[in-house]
Amino acid sequence: MVIPGVCICSHCEFHDRASLTDRPGWLRLYGAESLNSHFTQSLLGCRQQSFYMEAETKVEFQPENFKQMAGLAYYYNTQCYYYLHITWDDQFGRILSIIKNDLGKGSYPIGMGVSIPEKGPVWLKLTTRKETAQFSYA
């Protein structure tokens, strides 16, 4: 799969988990297993090549339950990552939350997250400065 201006992935086999044609101008990823999975994740990744970097994406996602998530991950492996994601909370509706996975132990460093509008896109951003990583959204 080739994503213009982003990266070339000649060895990737997305099959039915990703599409550049279902919605022209957008990359659509279809859900699979969690970031903890060693098998079928729906994940597009690029290697961090500098201590100073920014990654930003626009996400349109309307989850129907708490098991559905989409977002931006700072990912080392299945046991070590931070994941800023849109999901669903039965009390607050659509929310933005962070999962921290440290050596396989998951936690929610900002609690249950923050409410966001029920519909519409959300911009997610990751900024790193040496040993510091910061997520932001708009």
What is the role of each PLM region?
Residues 1-138:
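Extracellular glycan-recognition regions
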